Amino acid sequence: MSGSRNLWRWWKDGVDALAFGNPLYDMVLGGRTVPALAAVPLDPWPGSAANGSAILANQFRFAEQTLTLREPPNTEAFWQPNDASDAWYAGLHSFHWLRDLRALGGDEARRQARTLVLGWLCCHASWNGDSWAPAIVGARVANWIGLHDFFFASADEGFRFCVFDSLGRQTRHLRRVLPDHKRGAALITAIKGLAYGGLCLPQNQGCLTQVRRLLDQTLGVEILADGGHIERNPSIHLAVLRDLIDIRSVFRVARVEVPAKLINAIDRMTPALRFMRHGDGSLVLFNGGREEDPALIETVLAQADSRSRPLRTAPELRFERLHGGRALVVLDAGPPPPPGYNRRAHAGTLSFEFSVGRERLVTNCGSHPEFSNPWHTALAGTAAHSTVTIAETNSSGVVSQGGVEHPPGQVTCTRRETADEITIIASHNGYVPSFGLLHRRTLHLDQHGDTLHGEDSLEPAVAGSASPASASTAASAASSASSAPPPTAPRPFAIRFHLHPAVQAQIVDGIDGPTVILRSASGTAWRFTAEGGTIELAESIYRGTAGPPRPTLQIVVHGEVGLEGASVGWAFHREHATP
């Protein structure tokens, strides 16, 4: 997959260079330079004063990488440092860091913003295959316009002319290239830039029809019926919702009717975002997502201004949420996202996270934003998730430069609720091709949130064993089972429960064998027990937030599965509760 992706990118880069990287195209992008904005949207998003202070010293941190740029800003070496990752490069050229300078405030921060924008114009005013990628252009146009009042409303006429001229050129480029084979969050960001340029720059309102058409086409495909984003990544969901709120804002400030599909998408995505939060206000960790800043999440929810009802279940997004007392469990009950949307996807089907109040207990390991970094591949693997692995094999193939291949063809899920508990029964056939085994996971959370019971079964795959929900899925399951190799014996398996770094754990001898005592940061104690396997405490890491990996522990239940299959029952009991 990565080879074909690289070949496509090589071919596309060559075509783009011929079409856009010439003086004639520079002339095509020319046009009348406007003297002022027709509309100025507000930018409600927070920045970091600490990051702003670092930027005064030309130190930039994006995507887990910090670089100090020692060359003058009006040189190419400043804007294209040799050791920058792709994600870092995108962060620099998107100019979202202008918010950090605004948060710092003062004349020095404003002067630095103008110096850096002018330096960029010296080096990248004409098309460049990297810095003019549609998503980067879209972010840059929106950030320059949205932060107009901070860095160039009071600037001299020469500076203002250069910025307005570049904004016009970048907007015309977006109008010519979109959708440019883009999809997912990158396309939404590019559309946002086109909307800002089209609605805020006088005489560019011709973009409006294109913006409406692109929104209709994109939102109809990428925002699912329950409000989830098709990439199944909570961080991407947050970013897309934020972009859509910005697009709605620029329609409003320009006094143009907001597209109905845009309003509907925001109203559906808002409760889905709440669905993906833990009690600490941050996000669950699935498919490359991070915790994210809870203050930013609150701002997004407030700006969404949606009165949609909260979700109990997300059947299209394919996540399930169990809530009892102050306890919360979120289960990934679906396959990775489809091709074209799975670059950030993980092989974490049927993994779950478990929190109580504001404290996370069981988590997934997190992610790394740079596809070429070895951490990205390692964290995308099944073993970095709180679920089952067989013989250290991924449930979906993990591609080294991002993405997955050969995902489970069948993932089923049933939800049952009573007055006493919520039960989820889910299964996937990702291990059928290699081992002829179906993984079935059952979770029960009691109404008080004192006990989480689970059972993980590895069952020989036979036609109908996946409990498919329809005739078409039954046919798929039967085909998968009939082509599967016979189960072999013995095969080692491991059920992993990665613990949050704030959780302390130790193995103790119990009446029925070894158990694990967990203690949260607040001192609340939980006891983990298991039947059908051997309990071990092992090292793990946590990358749910920015910064270096944080050491932590994982509970691992080991066992072997043979021709007859295997089953392990396990439970987390709050210590004051009766098991």
Functional labels for PLM-detected ranges:
Residues 1-72:
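Extreme N-terminal leader/anchor segments
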Residues 63, 323-327, 357, 391, ...:
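Short strand-coil-strand connectors
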Residues 189, 347-349, 383-385:
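Short, solvent-exposed loop/turn segments at the edges of secondary structure
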Residues 68-74, 109-114:
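Helix-turn-helix repeat elements of alpha-solenoid scaffolds
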Residues 85-266:
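Aromatic-lined, polymer-binding surfaces characteristic
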Residues 93, 318, 350, 384, ...:
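Residues that flank catalytic or metal-binding motifs in active/ligand-binding sites
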Residues 224, 228-365, 417, 552, ...:
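Carbohydrate-active enzyme catalytic cores, enriched for enzymes
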Residues 86, 138, 184, 367-579:
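CBM-like, beta-strand-rich accessory domains located in the C-terminal region of large
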